A protein has these predicted regions:
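Amphipathic C-terminal alpha-helical segment
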Residues: 100, 150-168, 182-191
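Hydrophobic alpha-helical connector segments
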Residues: 57, 70-97, 139, 145-149
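Amphipathic alpha-helical packing segments from all-alpha helical-bundle domains
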Residues: 110-136, 143-147, 174-185
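Short secondary-structure transition hinges
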Residues: 89, 96-126, 158, 162, ...
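Helix-turn-helix
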Residues: 11, 19-53, 57
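Alpha-helical structural segments
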Residues: 11-18, 22, 53-72, 82, ...
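N-terminal intrinsically disordered/low-complexity leader segments
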Residues: 1-7, 190-191
Length: 191
């Protein structure tokens, strides 16, 4: 009779995610995770074929953390602006997860930037819908606006996650609003 599984796959992923939150993806080793679980590395390999499989699950779990930040932002009175603020807040509160998701070399680089957001952002369509609902833009223009603001807010978030500069909330809102309004004015003016 095989030994009873003491730790579920989900519990291991949750503990691994916490380890990565605290110390970064490089700290996610079988030994470190086993120590956190109070077990031996053998327990991990009873649930996962190898560490690459576990790391892939941790990345999915980290993506769900971002999705939750964006979901909450989309409930705000000014959802699109709040999405930009949320990404910077995520970088501030979860710098290791931000670096894992957005600052590591990709195994599968994207060839055209316009493909990036639809592929990487689980809330892409919801964000586009919020832009079209709040601004006099077409879906195509909303996609371009989101692309521009993503690049801008990603730069700010990268500065925050790497510890270069910690933007204040008023500063973030002011900068994002100014850029967003300028882009919308430019797009609407071309019609």
């Amino acid at each position: 009779m095989p030994p009873k599984v003491k730790f579920s796959k989900e519990a291991m992923i949750g503990t691994a995610l916490q380890l990565v939150r605290e110390e970064g993806i490089a700290s996610l080793t079988a030994r470190a995770l086993a120590e956190k679980l109070g077990a031996t590395p053998r327990v991990i390999f009873g649930q996962f074929t190898n560490m690459a499989e576990l790391q892939a699950e941790v990345i999915v779990a980290a993506e769900m953390v971002v999705v939750e930040y964006i979901r909450k932002a989309l409930e705000d009175e000014k959802p699109f602006r709040s999405v930009g603020v949320a990404s910077i807040l995520f970088a501030s509160k979860e710098p290791q997860l931000f670096q894992l998701l957005f600052q590591n070399p990709s195994k599968d680089p994207i060839r055209r930037f316009q493909d990036f957001l639809p592929m990487k952002d689980h809330s892409y369509q919801l964000v586009l819908d919020s832009i079209v609902a709040d601004y006099p833009l077409t879906v195509e223009e909303a996609g371009r606006l989101y692309q521009h603001l993503f690049i801008y807010s990603h730069g700010m978030a990268s500065m925050v996650a790497s510890g270069i500069y910690q933007f204040g909330m008023e500063e973030v809102i002011g900068l994002l609003t100014e850029v967003c309004q300028s882009l919308i004015k430019e797009m609407v003016g071309k019609k």
